[in-house]
């Protein structure tokens, strides 16, 4: 029994040491043409960039996303299958040492609402912005 507790504690410490520390983990439920706005901030050097996104069409299990990031427009399609459900975007490309990738994951579509998940590792954080 003592060995089980000891190995359990070692396992928990291992998970804590190597676990992912998300600075951004936000679930979004958006209706068609509903706009989500936020400011993405790098806490290590206080840089900020704006993100605006909305979806316009859901057909054949594909969701058409329109996004504006750092005043640059993007349009892409995300699908519900695992291979094509994520769009990754470099946030601060000028910082080579930082792992500053913002991920938008398409989770589900029910009752005319798309469920998306916005993820990024620390030191990135976000604050919502009024549309």
Language model region names:
Residues 18-131:
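Surface-exposed, beta-sheet-biased, low-hydrophobicity segments with strongly acidic/polar composition
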Residues 1-2, 15, 106:
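Generic cytosolic/nucleocytoplasmic N-terminal low-complexity/intrinsically disordered segments
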């Amino acid at each position: 029994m003592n060995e089980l507790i000891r190995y359990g504690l070692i396992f928990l410490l291992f998970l804590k040491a190597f676990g992912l520390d998300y600075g951004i983990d936000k679930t979004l439920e958006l209706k068609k043409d509903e706009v989500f706005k936020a400011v993405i901030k790098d806490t290590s050097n206080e840089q900020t960039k704006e993100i605006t996104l909305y979806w316009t069409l859901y057909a054949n299990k594909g969701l058409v996303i329109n996004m504006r990031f750092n005043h640059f427009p993007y349009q892409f399609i995300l699908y519900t299958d695992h291979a094509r459900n994520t769009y990754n975007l470099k946030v601060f490309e000028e910082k080579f040492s930082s792992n500053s990738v913002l991920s938008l994951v398409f989770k589900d579509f029910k009752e005319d609402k798309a469920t998306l998940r916005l993820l990024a590792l620390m030191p990135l954080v976000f604050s919502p912005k009024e549309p």
